[in-house]
């Protein structure tokens, strides 16, 4: 069996359909390798950062918060969008750590990068872990409400296995932390 090399697709044009506060919705005109023209719906996003905060007892701090798109609460690691496409992912992760759970850290280490849904969005999430947490002041946005919860790594793996954690970035982060940190 011969392996055929994939050919690159070409973006011929982009039409802004909606500009939002957090994301922009585009219609891309594409030229595919067989010569056909097609349209793709694409959400362009500045990117985000997320952090696995590990407290002095080795517990991981998560937030439970409401997500309107699914009309339910999700258990997630602290995360948030970058202020611009130029903002360093680590700077964003450190900011979200303080804003959402009220901690700074001495050690912020990169775990993995994650494309949240590459079929239709450019969003890339830089995922970090934070150790040696230092108490600071929580700075939630005006319309942001979270409940802080702490779990051991085995408890989180069990919650993932039982389908009680369904947030993709959180699943990727916890499993990457488990594998890469040898826990």
Model-based region annotation:
Residues 9, 13-50, 56:
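Acidic, metal-coordinating catalytic segment for phosphate/diphosphate chemistry
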